[in-house]
């Protein structure tokens, strides 16, 4: 595998805590003004799922205040969070177990979670309500649209992408989220000194991620103190995966500082 900034190989994971498989969808990339640039095959697997009564009740209480659908409009994060604080974007929050734990560990940051799976978001909303976590906001939709249209350039302190779908079949590699254009987009949204933290349990995808990330000129080895934690909680799904011996590779880059 190519040498990569702060790569860590420390165990396995299962994608069950992320998103559940379903029929892939296709879309188009838009620029910041909303004009279509080129066709894009979406990287996520979207699936419908009914909410429990308790989840729906929590959703009805929490969503109007801390949730929003992805749109073409720039996001005013300080107004939404009610404070100006370092902003971290988590792409693909799944059921939100790691999201909630990391937000509680970093009360000084604003954490924005993007997910397409409504039942997963509902579980996260329940955790936020139960544990009274004040520093999480959630977006439902395609993370690429969030990055392209909703996030201001050079506004993010960090981006987390934990266990993106590896799309292991060669004919599906075009659906992978972490490819060169995505790295360029993420880098453009990070502040100087900001951090990109990626984790995957798929060895071949890890190599492809490392190659694409190392080729991005705005990203480099992180040789300064990180503005966000790199410690992830182990979810029950990841714990099960540890038992079968699938290795996790973690990759961390920093945006170059002038």
Swiss-Prot record:
Identify which top EC class this enzyme belongs to. transferase
- Asked if the keyword Metal-binding belongs to this entry, the reply reads no
PROSITE patterns per the record?
SAM_MT_TRMB (PS51625)
Report the InterPro entries cross-referenced here: SAM-dependent_MTases_sf (IPR029063), tRNA_(Gua-N-7)_MeTrfase_Trmb (IPR003358), tRNA_methyltr_TrmB_bact (IPR055361)
UniProt keyword annotations, A-Z? Methyltransferase, S-adenosyl-L-methionine, Transferase, tRNA processing
Binding-site residues for S-adenosyl-L-methionine, renumbered to this chain: 90, 115, 142, 165
EC no. given is: 2.1.1.33
Reactions the enzyme catalyzes: guanosine(46) in tRNA + S-adenosyl-L-methionine = N(7)-methylguanosine(46) in tRNA + S-adenosyl-L-homocysteine
Q: Under what name is this protein listed?
A: tRNA (guanine-N(7)-)-methyltransferase
Question: What organism does the UniProt record list as the source?
Answer: Rhodococcus jostii (strain RHA1)
> Which gene name belongs to this protein?
trmB
């Amino acid at each position: 595998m190519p040498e990569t900034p702060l790569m860590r190989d420390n165990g396995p994971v299962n994608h069950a805590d992320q998103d559940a498989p379903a029929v892939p969808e296709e879309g188009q990339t838009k620029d910041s003004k909303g004009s279509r640039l080129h066709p894009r095959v979406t990287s996520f697997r979207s699936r419908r799922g009914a909410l429990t009564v308790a989840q729906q009740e929590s959703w009805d209480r929490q969503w109007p205040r801390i949730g929003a659908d992805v749109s073409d409009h720039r996001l005013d994060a300080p107004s939404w969070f009610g404070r100006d604080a370092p902003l971290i974007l988590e792409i693909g929050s799944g059921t939100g177990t790691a999201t909630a734990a990391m937000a509680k560990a970093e009360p000084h940051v604003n954490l924005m979670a993007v997910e397409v799976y409504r039942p997963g978001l509902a579980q996260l909303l329940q955790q936020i309500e139960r544990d009274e976590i004040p520093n999480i906001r959630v977006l439902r939709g395609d993370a690429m649209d969030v990055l392209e249209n909703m996030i201001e350039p050079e506004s993010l302190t960090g981006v987390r992408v934990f266990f993106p779908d590896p799309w292991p079949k060669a004919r599906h590699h075009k659906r992978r989220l972490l490819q060169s254009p995505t790295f360029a987009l993420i880098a453009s949204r990070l502040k100087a000194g900001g951090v990109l933290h990626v984790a995957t349990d798929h060895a071949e995808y890890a190599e492809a991620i490392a190659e694409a990330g190392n080729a991005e000129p705005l990203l480099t080895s992180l040789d300064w103190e990180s503005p966000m934690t790199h410690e992830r909680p182990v979810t029950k799904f990841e714990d099960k995966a540890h038992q079968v011996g699938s290795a996790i590779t973690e990759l961390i880059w920093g945006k170059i500082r002038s």
